[in-house]
Amino acid sequence: MVILPVSQLSTNLGLSLVSPTKNNPVMGNVSERNQVNQPISAKRVAVVGAGVSGLAAAYKLKSNGLNVTLFEADSRAGGKLKTVVKDGLIWDEGANTMTESDEEVTSLFDDLGIREKLQLPISQNKRYIARDGLPVLLPSNPVALLKSNILSAKSKLQIMLEPFLWKKHNGAKVSDENAQESVAEFFERHFGKEFVDYLIDPFVAGTSGGDPQSLSMRHAFPELWNIENRFGSVISGFIQSKLSSKKEKGGEKQSSNKKPRVRGSFSFQGGMQTLVDTICKEFGEDELKLQSEVLSLSYSHNGSLTSENWSVSSMSNSTIQDQPYDAVVVTAPINNVKELKIMKVENPFSLDFIPEVSCLPLSVIITTFKKTNVKRPLEGFGVLVPSNEQHNGLKTLGTLFSSMMFPDRAPSDVYLYTTFVGGSRNRELAKASTDELKQIVSSDLQQLLGTEGEPTFVNHFYWSKAFPLYGRNYDSVLRAIEKMERDLPGLFYAGNHKGGLSVGKSIASGYKAAELAISYLESNKMTEETI
């Protein structure tokens, strides 16, 4: 879930890559193509995992003329994008919204022609956090923050003086890449502890299920980390970066007719599943293989420049099948990849060097209340609950006002709420029973919104591994992924373990992996042609 505007904390995790040149349409029968000097359009690429990263990677590969097979062990595509329609209600059990903060998302939307299906939330700038047991409207800009009562006068003064009084990390060079500073330590150095407790803490809980003490600043907020490296002061650096960005955008407007990106968060008509379904329509039955579990990967390159160095073994309906490919894009969770059987030139290739990644559990509870039984309804996006508010009896991470944002998600006489419980704050509570969670959610909503009586509808969905935790040692995970890609030519990794947790970052990760695969295949083709 995302409640705070991402732009307030500038959490761009992506790196742009130059898009490869479009190629000819896909050729027909694979067995008929020239093995010595194939056009790239005859190459075959396997994509393992049909979450949003896998779908994006497969779409990018196919749009460049490649033969693609997308393997998914589950009976449905989309991963953690999952919309349910039931009893006149529409809700998402995974991500509820996304942003268009990455150019890869813009490219995908334009190619799919899906913009007419975008659904913008009503009053999305009205977002709340709990303070002293009650919801408080979150200021939408720095000036409003200084005028509000959300922070003490001391904290406001520290924010205003940050350009002059910010502190370096333990007196060391700020740009020391070995520093494993937490999100809490970083923001406390710049803005103080209250800023962390009542703004950063609920934000990271709402976007990643994490807590600021456990998250790595460099990996959770790399743009702000880099701003400090360049400018020292976060405020000064942010202002200078924005001014520079405006100049660049001004130049782009004069030289191109690019469509402006959607500002803020949005969903789709019918929920986030609409994005998944739209992408899936681009693939035939032979390309998108559901309930097909990949058992093993085998790399057989022996030094000669021949195609189809990869073999993918998969099982569907108790039938095991081996198929040859020229490259593989893997998008499964890294802990699952670690357990995958891989052979390299007929020898087992161990992935023991990949560290275990801690993943955070999350329960999603959907409730409805008759409007007459909600005495203090709030218009807007939702409310986040800081960890400190547990002392005031609040146990949830936050609640989205789903039918306030999107009125078509529920009948006109009820309010639909989406509440989140668990994360690193309370892993055990995430695993509680539906009845227990119903009582917890009802209690929090009664305190925050004045709900009365029992909800008229309850649905509970549990994600045992909702988010990977970008902890202080996350460098070791990224180095392991790089080693895997380096040691296994033609294998590329994508997903929310690499590049960011949001839907947009996951799409960008899939696109970038596809671009690397295309570059790899083009490079091999050029080498073959010179021989």
UniProtKB/Swiss-Prot annotation:
Output the PANTHER family linked to this UniProt entry.
PROTOPORPHYRINOGEN OXIDASE (PTHR42923), PROTOPORPHYRINOGEN OXIDASE 2, CHLOROPLASTIC_MITOCHONDRIAL (PTHR42923:SF44)
Q: List the disulfide bonds.
A: none
Question: What cofactor does this one take?
Answer: FAD
Which protein is depicted? Protoporphyrinogen oxidase 2
Under SUPFAM superfamilies, the record lists: FAD-linked reductases, C-terminal domain, FAD/NAD(P)-binding domain
Q: Which UniProt keywords apply?
A: Chlorophyll biosynthesis, Chloroplast, FAD, Flavoprotein, Heme biosynthesis, Membrane, Mitochondrion, Mitochondrion inner membrane, Oxidoreductase, Plastid, Plastid inner membrane, Porphyrin biosynthesis, Transit peptide
Q: Which reaction does it catalyse?
A: protoporphyrinogen IX + 3 O2 = protoporphyrin IX + 3 H2O2
Q: What are its GO cellular component terms? A: chloroplast inner membrane; chloroplast thylakoid; mitochondrial inner membrane
Pathway(s) where this gene product acts: Porphyrin-containing compound metabolism; protoporphyrin-IX biosynthesis; protoporphyrin-IX from protoporphyrinogen-IX: step 1/1; Porphyrin-containing compound metabolism; chlorophyll biosynthesis
Give the record's cofactor note, including how many are bound: Binds 1 FAD per subunit.
**Gene encoding this chain?**
POX2
Please list the GO biological process terms of this entry: chlorophyll biosynthetic process; heme biosynthetic process; protoporphyrinogen IX biosynthetic process
* Organism of origin: Spinacia oleracea
Q: Show the transit peptide stretch.
A: 1-48
Q: What is its EC number?
A: 1.3.3.4
Source taxon at top rank:
Eukaryota
Q: What does this protein do?
A: Catalyzes the 6-electron oxidation of protoporphyrinogen-IX to form protoporphyrin-IX.
